[in-house]
């Protein structure tokens, strides 16, 4: 019988020696739903890309131009709310349930303030952003509308991400995956009606008129926004109604505490800076790619979506590692934190190695899901096969960084990611793009990911990431 995370935490606090088989089972029990959740999230991205891609390469390029900016803005917010889930994991590991509920309440206030502020900022710059990024004049109107709608939904996007992260910190990885599954299904339905115009379809041999808004690119953003809003409200509802260590119906204060602010600064600031550094580098990469033509822009955007099929497993295991290492550190069990870190990292490397093989074999078919443009498919398949060789080391960096974040060592992750992304990838892409085009940009990415994975494995082996100690 698999231990629950709550039972494991109790045994760790008592100083018991938990068998490796038990730790492996609980790591799998938390990882599998998280991997499935990442699969659903990636499927939602595939749906958007495929439905828009079949409109034409211009529509795909319109989204691709602003995609790196969505990563930048969302990434900063993810860094901040991940800091809240790390605090909760460590407090639950130390059996400080009242403190964990206090952090949850404070996170809800931060979510409201930051979400509304980010939405206002994104909508405000949406009119000018495509031009800043060098988009062709023919793409700017649809790119601007897409980014404005996406930005307006940020409070709900943050709510879904933050509250599902809280649930995972308690050891409940199943509920977030079910919420994500529903969100994906709703996204399909909304996109079906919002992207396409009113049209005739064959249903059981009969021609049926189906209403459609015909919004094209903005319709994809609106469908995702509506489905994510429902997901965020559902996650909040679970936290409001369910009994358990994070039940906020139990008495407690909504006051923002100095301890929470200190921990948010210590963990959240480097995480947000890391996300900003990675995403702003992606913005510069898109700026480099935007000068290579519409086919290269579309192939790059769809290639990134296709590659998501590979690294979703890594991010699913990363979610589990944050919860596991966070609770082990909270229970003051360095030995268990190390065990979980290496166990999860090896799982990530192994699964992403298999994913890389699949990516190399099925690259043309994956690109064909998103577009019928032969030139885009050919170029996209070529760069995906380059990227396939980096997947195992990319998995190492993803999961090892999650382990370090769970221990509160977000500064170390920031430094390694900053060096590899800005010192290696951008430099190589700048040098190779004029000579090799999009192939050069993705070759730079492959080299950088291998270097990044090696750096994270070295830091994991040295063990200094555990020196931060438990949060106050």
Q: Where are the regions that the model predicts?
A:
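Short alpha-helical transmembrane segments in multi-pass integral membrane proteins
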Residues: 1-34, 88-155, 186, 197-269, ...
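N-terminal transmembrane alpha-helices
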Residues: 18-50, 54-55, 68-87, 112-119, ...
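Transmembrane helical elements of multi-pass membrane transporters/channels
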Residues: 29-48, 149, 160, 227-231, ...
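Helix-terminus/linker motif at the lipid-water interface of multi-pass membrane proteins
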Residues: 39-61, 130-137, 193-197, 207-215, ...
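Alpha-helical transmembrane segments of multipass membrane proteins
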Residues: 46-50, 128, 162-166, 188-193, ...
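Small-residue-rich hydrophobic transmembrane alpha-helices
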Residues: 60-120, 157-176, 286, 299-357, ...
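Hydrophobic alpha-helical membrane segments of integral membrane proteins
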Residues: 175-179, 222, 415-416, 443-444
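Small-residue-enriched core segments of transmembrane alpha-helices in multipass membrane transport
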Residues: 180-187, 305-308, 418-427
């Amino acid at each position: 019988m698999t231990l629950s995370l709550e039972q494991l935490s109790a045994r760790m606090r008592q100083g018991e020696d938990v068998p490796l088989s038990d730790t492996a089972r609980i790591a799998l029990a938390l990882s599998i739903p998280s991997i499935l959740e990442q699969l659903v999230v990636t499927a939602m991205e595939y749906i958007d890309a495929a439905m828009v891609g079949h409109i034409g390469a211009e529509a795909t390029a319109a989204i691709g131009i602003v995609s790196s900016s969505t990563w930048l803005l969302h990434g900063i917010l993810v860094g901040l709310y991940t800091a809240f889930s790390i605090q909760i994991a460590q407090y639950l590991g130390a059996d400080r349930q009242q403190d964990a509920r206090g952090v949850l309440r404070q996170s809800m206030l931060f979510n409201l303030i930051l979400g509304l502020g980010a939405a206002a900022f994104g909508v405000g710059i949406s009119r000018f952003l495509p031009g800043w990024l060098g988009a062709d004049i023919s793409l700017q109107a649809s790119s601007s509308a897409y980014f404005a709608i996406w930005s307006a939904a940020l409070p709900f996007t943050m709510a879904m991400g933050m509250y599902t992260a809280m649930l995972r910190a308690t050891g409940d990885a199943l509920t977030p995956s079910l919420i994500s599954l529903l969100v994906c299904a709703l996204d399909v339905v909304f996109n079906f009606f919002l992207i396409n115009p009113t049209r005739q379809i064959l249903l059981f041999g009969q021609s049926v008129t189906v209403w459609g808004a015909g919004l094209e690119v903005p319709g994809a953003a609106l469908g995702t926004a509506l489905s994510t809003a429902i997901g965020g409200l559902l996650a909040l509802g679970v936290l409001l109604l369910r009994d358990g260590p994070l039940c906020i119906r139990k008495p407690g204060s909504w006051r923002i505490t100095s301890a929470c602010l200190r921990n948010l600064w210590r963990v959240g600031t480097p995480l947000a800076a890391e996300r900003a550094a990675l995403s702003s580098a992606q913005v510069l990469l898109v700026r480099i790619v935007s000068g290579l033509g519409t086919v290269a822009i579309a192939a790059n955007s769809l290639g990134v979506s296709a590659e998501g099929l590979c690294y979703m497993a890594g991010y699913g295991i990363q979610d589990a590692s944050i919860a596991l290492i966070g609770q082990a550190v909270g229970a003051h069990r360095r030995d268990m934190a190390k065990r979980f870190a290496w166990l999860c990292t090896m799982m990530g490397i192994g699964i992403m190695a298999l994913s890389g093989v699949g990516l190399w074999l099925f690259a043309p078919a994956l690109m064909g899901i998103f577009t019928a443009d032969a030139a885009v498919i050919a170029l996209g398949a070529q760069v995906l096969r380059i990227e396939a060789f980096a997947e195992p080391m990319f998995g190492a960096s993803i999961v090892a960084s999650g382990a370090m974040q769970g221990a509160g060592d977000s500064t170390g992750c920031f430094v390694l990611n900053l060096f590899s992304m800005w010192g290696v990838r951008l430099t190589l892409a700048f040098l190779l793009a004029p000579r090799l085009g999009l192939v050069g940009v993705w070759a730079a990415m492959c080299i950088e990911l291998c270097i990044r994975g090696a750096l994270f494995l070295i830091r994991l082996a040295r063990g200094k990431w555990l020196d931060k100690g438990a949060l106050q």
